């Protein structure tokens, strides 16, 4: 497990974007070899997406041979609703890059058969060769995707009822009106993410500090689903200084002492530009 600690949100976002960029380029994707990337929504990854868009526009990075799989989608929210995750991904990322829309996979929360939709999503991931790198964020209660506290740590893509804490947290996106917030969602399972060859979790802000503490300093616990990734062979937690406030001083000191190693993963930043 790696814990990468940056000074602030902007630097954490940039480090994560550089890492994704380098992983894609080093993979050497092509028409017969697509890079598969799991993606989150929410406020945390926005800075990372902006940097990836910059790398694309500068010619350093192409998503032509990348397939993406998003973590989740609300049930019953129209696809073109401004708060649907289809809209989020299109407006904040996909419309700014060269990904083929047919390669951007997002669960359909309006499918006539939601169980079949979940099973089909798992099948598509398998047919794509599995996820090479799954990027995620967490809630203050340590949930990843919509795997709320108490979720099975071997769960697969499924229909989930959202916890009241999640509904309250999401109300800000629906004019503060709880009656407008969806109460159910389709989500990848913890087991789905664990199957990825590598997982990178973005955690920023003091309000996520206790969740980071639970994620790495205490044992695996289904009440803090992010803690499952202690058992993944290749997990990277990327955080800012504020998110470390609940960690032991010696933990922070230990991982900061490894930053020269971590920075070799992103420096130099690779490029797809032709020399």
From Swiss-Prot:
Assembly behavior: Homohexamer.
GO CC terms: cytoplasm
Organism of derivation: Xenopus tropicalis
GO MF term (any one): glucosamine-6-phosphate deaminase activity
Reaction catalyzed: alpha-D-glucosamine 6-phosphate + H2O = beta-D-fructose 6-phosphate + NH4(+)
InterPro entries: Glc/Gal-6P_isomerase, Glucosamine6P_isomerase, Glucosamine6P_isomerase_CS, NagB/RpiA_transferase-like
Name of the protein in question: Glucosamine-6-phosphate deaminase 2
Keyword annotations of the record: Carbohydrate metabolism, Coiled coil, Cytoplasm, Hydrolase
Superkingdom of source: Eukaryota
Lineage: Eukaryota, Metazoa, Chordata, Craniata, Vertebrata
NCBIfam families linked to this entry: nagB
Intracellular or extracellular location(s): Cytoplasm
GO BP field: carbohydrate metabolic process; N-acetylglucosamine metabolic process
Gene3D superfamilies in UniProt: 3.40.50.1360
């Amino acid at each position: 497990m790696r814990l990468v600690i940056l000074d602030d949100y902007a630097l954490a976002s940039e480090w994560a974007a550089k890492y994704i960029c380098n992983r894609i380029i080093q993979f050497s994707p092509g028409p017969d070899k697509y890079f598969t990337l799991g993606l989150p929504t929410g406020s945390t990854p926005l800075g990372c997406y902006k940097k990836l868009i910059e790398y694309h526009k500068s010619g350093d990075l192409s998503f032509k041979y990348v397939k993406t799989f998003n973590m989740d989608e609300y049930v019953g929210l129209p696809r073109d609703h401004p708060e649907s995750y289809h809209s989020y991904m299109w407006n904040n990322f996909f419309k700014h890059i060269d990904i083929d829309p047919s390669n951007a996979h997002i669960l359909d929360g309006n499918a006539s058969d939601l169980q079949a939709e979940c099973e089909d999503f798992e099948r598509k991931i398998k047919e794509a060769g599995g996820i090479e790198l799954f990027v995620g964020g967490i809630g203050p209660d340590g949930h990843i995707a919509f795997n709320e506290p108490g979720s099975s740590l071997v769960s697969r893509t499924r229909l989930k009822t959202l916890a009241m804490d999640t509904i309250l947290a999401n109300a800000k996106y629906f004019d503060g009106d709880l009656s407008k917030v969806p109460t159910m969602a389709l989500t990848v399972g913890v087991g789905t993410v664990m199957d990825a060859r590598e997982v990178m979790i973005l955690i920023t802000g003091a309000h996520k500090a206790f969740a980071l503490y639970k994620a790495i300093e205490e044992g695996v616990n289904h009440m803090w689903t992010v803690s499952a990734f202690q058992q993944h062979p290749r997990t990277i937690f990327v955080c800012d200084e504020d998110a470390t406030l609940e960690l032991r001083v010696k933990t922070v000191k230990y991982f900061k002492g490894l930053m020269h190693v971590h920075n070799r993963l992103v420096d130099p930043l690779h490029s797809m530009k032709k020399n």
